[in-house]
Amino acid sequence: GAHRAAARDLLELLLSTGMFGQAVVATDDPAWGETLADLPVVVDLDPSGEPFHFGPRLARLIERYGAKRVLYSGGASAPLLSAERWHEVLTRLGEAERLVVTNNLHSCDWVGFVPALEMVPQIAQETNDNAIAWLMAHGAGLPAVHLPASAGTRFDLDTPLDLLIAHRHPGIGPCLRRFLDELGWVSRQLDQVMVAMAQEGSSLAVVGRVSSAAWAALERATRCWVRVYAEERGMRASGRQGRGEVRSLLADYVELVGVEAFFEELAQLADGVLFDNRVILAARKLWPSAFDRFNSDLYRWDRVEEPFLRHFTRVAAEVPVPVVLGGHSVVAGGLMALAEALEIEQGET
């Protein structure tokens, strides 16, 4: 639901630029495709009975529509990117003969490129969209432009916690806003962390695969004292997680003193905590199901089946300071979105 709402917002925003010759929506959901009948888009349904493979699917679309210049995006990949930024991207793409432009060259959520047909052989080999901008720049030699790190370029909707974060930002589109209003989710922890962020002289702890850009955004937006415990950035992309090589000093400390004592100590150091707990899980060679991880993020600890994560979440819920649990986003794009939302709010008061 949220992804469809965000995709509708993105389509309407991009179409409003008047800079597209053709807009194609590739989906496996014919019912959702029918809801787009009022928009000037072509709905291209995934072939039935075939397993989905990202690279071959995108390559076939480029060939089918004879595209010279392509902007590819997942539906929920840029819920905060402004119309002005999109206009900048499309202008650059329209003026170039050889170019790749993206939000993040190392792990892209959307990418524009020209000449598209020339890129088809490389694209067809890719299993997902994360590496295609890097491939075009370094494998195919296209000149590359990536936008500066910001909430608009680094925040997307990957997890339920991202929906809670998005709901607090005034820049989301009307369809997503309406969906989240109707969803009605609340998070005491996130509300209280936002209060701490707005309070001059409060202390915040940011834990996990902390983005330097997110840390800088937090420093700009607040007048708080910030403790950063950064570990294992790139643990997935480097293959360390897959090989069981993730190491974490905090995970070792949790093992040494126990979960309760760990959180007791953390609560004495900060008035609010943003905690990417995936590093501790990976260091313990745990990777619970998405169901467990997301229920933990929402503090539905009673629905978490993995014993350590269930216990960790329950203890975090009882800490006297707010602890926002999540994945990478909570200390990267999501944190940048919270910082930007706070700046906008303070600018209006």
Show which residues each predicted segment covers.
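N-terminal glycine-rich phosphate-binding loop and ensuing alpha1 helix
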Residues: 1-26, 306, 310-313
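Short, high-confidence coil segments that cap the C-terminus of an alpha-helix
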Residues: 20, 67, 96-98, 201-202
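Short phosphate-binding loop-to-helix
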Residues: 31, 35-70, 129
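Catalytic metal- and UDP-sugar-binding loop of GT-A-like glycosyltransferases, i.e.
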Residues: 73-75
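Conserved donor-nucleotide/metal-binding helix-loop-beta segment in metal-dependent transferases, i.e.
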Residues: 78-106
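Short, glycine-/small-residue-rich phosphate/pyrophosphate-handling segment
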Residues: 97-98, 114-139
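Short glycine- and hydrophobic/aromatic-rich loop-to-beta-strand nucleating segment
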Residues: 108-113
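Conserved alpha/beta core of the MobA/IspD/sugar-nucleotide pyrophosphorylase nucleotidyltransferase superfamily
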Residues: 127-349
